[in-house]
Amino acid sequence: MASTVYLDVFMGDAEAHASLDASYKHSCDLLSKNAAIYGLPSTPEELSEEQQELLKEVDKLHELRFTPPPPLCVGRLVFNLSSSPGLSKTTANFAALCTGDRGPCKNAPSKKLHYLGCSMHRIVKDFIAQGGDVTRGDGSGGESIYGGKFNDEKDGLKIKPRQGSLAMANSGKNSNTSQFFVVLTKEEKKLEKLTGKYVVFGELKEGWDVLSRLDMAGEANGRPNTPVWVGGCGRC
């Protein structure tokens, strides 16, 4: 039976989001202390413009926000990993990096063998979204659970990639680490560029809307137009 794993995709400016969230929480706290005194509703969202101005007069030192900022998480990608015995090493590597139960990286002991927090550092619009560099985060590193690189499994090289396919990124033959990519395109000519060169080991089961959001974050040069990272991951 095929194993199923997930990646929660986050997008945006985390620092700016934290600042907006802090402003909203401060507004909630301020309102809870003053609602009864001034006869105000219990939640910031219920305040009229006049009531908002009243609360601003109570606290002139802080910027108040009356609605929570939009969530950074844009959704979940759920993948079915291949059940082929000929891909067992590749699927075991990916699943373990999703759960993060293998401890620290051998070549970067301060980093975990875990996709959590990993950047999707390369997103080529209408082609691929790549991430999983657990050691450096920028595409120049990566490490498998086997301690470095591991060889291509031939069964995966025989699978023709399609939109939603999950494959190992590499820097040449037999150079798989933790880096992976998800196929964004349906175009045959672009798919042909991937065929036989990368080990395909999974397919998207759920989250096609999230795949579209990833594509929207992509540019022709591969640099995402907004920060994108894995904010949650594991087995389903």
What are these regions (language model features)?
Residues M1-C236:
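Cross-family detector of peptidyl-prolyl cis-trans isomerase
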